[in-house]
Amino acid sequence: MVSLLKKLIGSRNDRLLKEYRKQVAQINSLEPKISALSDEELLAKTQEFRDRHQQGTSLDDLLPEAFAVVREAGKRVFGMRHFDVQMLGGIALHNGKIAEMRTGEGKTLMATLPVYLNAIAGKGVHVVTVNDYLARRDAEWMGRLYRFLGMSTGVVVPQQPNDEKIAAYAADITYGTNNEFGFDYLRDNMEYRVEDRRQRRLFYAIVDEVDSILIDEARTPLIISGQAEDHTELYVRMNAVPPLLKRMASEPKPHEPEPEGDYWVDEKSQQVYMSEAGHESAEKILTRVGLLPEGESLYDPRHIALMHHMMVALRAHTLFFRDQQYVVQDDEVVIVDEFTGRLMVGRRWSDGLHQAVEAKEGVKIQHENQTLASITFQNYFRMYDKLSGMTGTADTEAYEFQEIYTLETVIIPTNKPMVRKDQNDQVFKTTQEKYQAILNDIRDCHERGQPVLVGTTSIENSELLAGLLRQAKLPHEVLNAKQHAREAEIVAEAGKPGHITIATNMAGRGTDIVLGGSVDKQVDLIHANEALSEAEKEVRIETLRAEWKPLNERVKQAGGLRIIGTERHESRRIDNQLRGRAGRQGDPGSSRFYLSLEDPLMRIFAGDRVRAIMERLKLPEGEPIEAGMVTRSIETAQRKVEGRNFDIRKQLLEYDDVANDQRKVLYSQRNEVLEAASIGATVEGLRDAAVAEMFRGFIPEESVEEQWDVAGLEKALAGDWHIQLPLTDMLEQEPNLTDEELLERVVAAARQIYTAKVEQVGAESWAQFERSIMLQSIDTHWREHLSALDYLRQGIHLRGYAQKNPKQEYKREAFELFSGMLDRIRDDVVRVLMTVRVQSAEQVEQAEADAAQRHVQNVQYHHSDYDEALADDGQPQGAQPVRNVLPKVGRNEPCPCGSGKKYKHCHGQLA
């Protein structure tokens, strides 16, 4: 029925493309007229568009003419004409949608269309890439077109001087990575001077590789942190504990005897759990190494931190492995991006995990950090007035884009039909059999002159395969995080006849593999050679292309680029990205995945079913199973994982939305403080409110005089705010004084003392001092609030045991924490300003300089893993325990939460 309806009225995608094609026809009709313009007339079009837009013409109405101008500029600057399908993609991007275009269809050039159109508004357009290399490359490459049309471009990269960053954001078009845009937003909300802020209002962003940034990295927030207290010795001593504990052969099953051992590992949830025997063993070991006093229990509230450190050490030993999740370089543990295989230099895991891995590897342990500011990409990118994205693989995640970002995915047709052959997976019983089949396939391609790209899921696997190829005497190149610097060079050679390239996940590589090899670098070198005349350059380039042509034909005859996958990834999208490297622009190509029942995805999610099929077929050793049914079975397993990951991201967003609402309120108030000419009226309001609250603590409203604690109020005013006021004497002299009149006198006294301070220092200097104190107080209490939210988040799932909704409880308690924080900011600001003794304007300036100095010390930037514990409401986790003070509970006693379970099977499991 659904398919019949689609045939009759077309799918939503078909209807959108039909609408867009009308606009493309309009753009094409303008081409002769625009082509007739001189370079100067084409440049003048930009100012004409700006004037028309200011006079009320919408960007939508300017689209046909603006796109036609960009197409003409592309022809004149690059000698490249935007295809009609690129126009379709450009219209989709302008309309705030995700354009899915196959690899090699020209996404970078397509983006120039909506970027130019939206830059006409003069509010700044951000083009977001996955790494600094692509940001610089695209800014330089596409910048030539924008400059030709009178638009300015900038690029933001890490460690860039602040004045350069400010200039880059002031440009019409700004290129940069998702991390840098996010960090700059956080930095702007930590600045103490308006002129030091970098970003303008977030107007329009185009996100390249949108699936990688908005989905793969959505669980990992950007964090700016500073150093916390030192636990170095504890990490080193705790590192000796995991090897002394015994791992269970399997996870305990209900109603079955518990397997022998101290702990089990849940690879699905990436957590480690202790058995009852394990807790006893751990206590004995910790006592023996001097970490736990004799006769005391790990369950004592004062040893909860010890428990946390032990569980972190166990995770470091059982779930995090060298050359898979991280590498060791220059005496440092460097995280490897699970999705792209890139080294994530400078990023650190949170909750002490990074320090535990450093202790395991015997490298220098760096200090733990306190979060200063944090935001997820989900919440950062949703702040843009308009957001769009482009990728080669978005359709599998279209539902998530729509659900979380309200971004619709439009599948753009290819310029030429795709002829790549995607063969069924081959599944072997063992890894050894799988690698033998891969070697045979690679050898066959190499002998026939067909280039091969082999995709692996980890650095370890890529180096294992490289070792096998060396033994087989097959020449090859390895492209992984360790070869990052040579990446573009390796990719340029990957399409040459018989070339073998091994690569970790190719997501976000950003460089096309051209059949016969790429000559772009040599062409660029010829263009840059000033010793050659233009005519000589043209001759050399023609010769170069003539030499490349037979190589290109030879590779096409051999079957184009061969893609070999050594494992299925959790996400079908990552597999599709690997396949998408072949078959660009109508080129031939083929792909196949080789799997074994020992692969992680197969073992955890699909192994039993496929193994049963293999046993029924009684396949001999080395013989694979290859059938559409098996491929579908694997894709079903991948869908399950994708569904679970989507649920986790959605849960995370629901929790983070609470923090995000608070962040927006606080940052808005902070910006008001920063931008206001004077905050004197604000401070006065805070002071009067603080005085009234203190006053009512001793003299409640509508109370009789016998209930008043006047002596206590006098003491509090003198101790907290240095207000010496003889309230007792006043009441004796004027017995008819009401509480309201008494409050007015206290408020007036506070105002008088404050006015004297202002007059002594000077109104201008004091106003600056007020601002500085207010900003410091906001920042300090916000940091503490972020830590409090973190602790709350880690333990909130326990409320599920008490038949409460953890999300509702989190919202309620987070609101209470936020209200309490605002009160503490108020009290802190009033206390400092009332008690500080300032004699001159010079002292004020020195205090501000000291604050600014403290403000920038030991700041680090992370994109660390969010703890998944909060995403699985009510499910037991091995996360950091809740820090509260509880009476000691025996493991076999009933749990104090009231669930009726034994403590060891309930909250004891989470300790």
From Swiss-Prot:
Location in the cell: Cell inner membrane; Cytoplasm
Reaction equation(s) it catalyzes: ATP + H2O + cellular proteinSide 1 = ADP + phosphate + cellular proteinSide 2
Keywords noted in UniProt: ATP-binding, Cell inner membrane, Cell membrane, Cytoplasm, Membrane, Metal-binding, Nucleotide-binding, Protein transport, Translocase, Translocation, Transport, Zinc
Region (Disordered): 869-888
Subunit structure: Monomer and homodimer. Part of the essential Sec protein translocation apparatus which comprises SecA, SecYEG and auxiliary proteins SecDF-YajC and YidC.
Cofactor comment text: May bind 1 zinc ion per subunit.
Name of this protein: Protein translocase subunit SecA
A single GO molecular function term of this UniProt record: metal ion binding
Membrane topology: Peripheral membrane protein
Alphabetical list of Pfam families matching this protein: P-loop_SecA, SEC-C, SecA_DEAD, SecA_PP_bind, SecA_SW
Principal subcellular localisation of the protein: membrane
Function: Part of the Sec protein translocase complex. Interacts with the SecYEG preprotein conducting channel. Has a central role in coupling the hydrolysis of ATP to the transfer of proteins into and across the cell membrane, serving both as a receptor for the preprotein-SecB complex and as an ATP-driven molecular motor driving the stepwise translocation of polypeptide chains across the membrane.
Enzyme Commission (EC) number: 7.4.2.8
Binding positions (ATP): Q86, G104, E105, G106, K107, T108, D512
Recorded family membership: Belongs to the SecA family.
CDD domains per record: DEXDc_SecA, SF2_C_secA
Signal peptide as annotated in the record: none
PANTHER family referenced in this protein's UniProt entry, alphabetically: CHLOROPLAST PROTEIN-TRANSPORTING ATPASE, SECA INNER MEMBRANE COMPONENT OF SEC PROTEIN SECRETION SYSTEM
EC supergroup of this enzyme: translocase
Any single GO CC term annotated in Swiss-Prot or TrEMBL for this entry: cytosol
Annotated organism of origin: Bordetella parapertussis (strain 12822 / ATCC BAA-587 / NCTC 13253)
